[in-house]
Amino acid sequence: MGDYTEHDRERMVVEGAKTAGLGSPDTEFTAGHRTQFARDRARVLHSAALRRLADKTQVMGPRDGDTPRTRLTHSIEVAQIGRSIADGLGCDPDLVDLAGLAHDIGHPPYGHNGEKALDAFADPYGGFEGNAQNLRILTRLEPKVLAPDGTSAGLNLTRAALDAAIKYPWGRTGPGTKFGAYDIDADRLAWIRKGAPDRVRSLECQIMDWSDDVAYSVHDVEDGVIAGRIDLRALADPQEQAALAAMGHRQHPELGVDELIAAAQRLSELPVVADAFRYDGTFASSVALKRLTSELVGRFATAAITATRAVAGPAPLVRYQASLGIPPIVAAEVAILKTVALRYVMSDPVHKQRQAAQRERIQAVATGLLATAPRHLDPQLLPWWVEADSDTARVRVIVDQIASYTESRLERVAAQLAG
């Protein structure tokens, strides 16, 4: 157990040796110092698509306060948490790290709110799903490698890397469902999934997904506390516990209301949580809040390692050799923390009003770009527009354009189109 194969390390396009070095193409740096998965991680790390996440909303907007988390900082945190779990289970840490960096790389401006707006615009033409856009960016849209026929292979990552980065390794099955590939990218998905069990995610992908949940639940609550939107004492209040549990059950129907109430109570009784009840922005309370986030991340990551080892044993685990174990009480704790952010930040009337304006802006830009295309399209997307032979293909180009925008650029284009 624990070995990656040549099949895992295969790339869609065979690449030649680098030629610009001062030594021979077979120098130690090229041939020995970097694994294929380390190269994959570097490609994601240096991509323009990753940098653009700095101006895309996580929960609080990129311009809300001095230190809000963005999609970029969130992705970096997911990568770090995932790397820690990978170290504990024997997966290649670079593989899980890059999956964390790439897991939101296809998200449009305004986060999940922008995703809803683009999905509504593109619904008759295959819809929009951030996870499917991840695959499209990694295998087509991010410029790095061309196939011999001149078509783009995107970053040309290894099979195992792409498989680790796809949360939902299947196509669209119906409205409102999560999926990892548009019909137009079915060939890419088939190549990635060659030899993989149907609808089963690799262990590296499961680690990335759990790390995403952990980062979301802990760090987004931290941002809400700092912004004055979340009071952690709600976790100890019976009335708020009941309200949170009811909302959490709607979001996570596999978890019962009583389980979620117990999770809130259990968290409220942890000394690190109680110490952060009275956050007021002072240095001491900031230390308490940071200790809370650190200890909760460790609690949730360690629980997954321990539960997985209890079933799979002590040997290094890779790919499809094991499933990640999540203890039910820990799953409930993460779910209740995610619900705290949902109830006190995302359900706020002012926040919802701003979200409505964001969706209208995306709809207006999408309609305007389609009506004036190809005038406002980026040069990189012009070949796709020229080759588009159907409304579905043309709408996909418009969606690719908007999904690539930062929030600042979207707002500039909206003003430009409005005249």
Curated annotation (Swiss-Prot):
Q: What UniProt keywords apply to this chain's record, in alphabetical order?
A: Hydrolase
Q: Name one GO biological process term.
A: dGTP catabolic process
Entry's SMART domains?
A: HDc (SM00471)
Is the keyword Ligase assigned to this protein?
no
Q: Which GO terms describe its molecular function?
A: dGTPase activity
Family affiliation:
Belongs to the dGTPase family. Type 2 subfamily.
Q: What is this protein called?
A: Deoxyguanosinetriphosphate triphosphohydrolase-like protein
- Where is the organism placed in the taxonomic lineage, from the top? Bacteria, Bacillati, Actinomycetota, Actinomycetes, Mycobacteriales
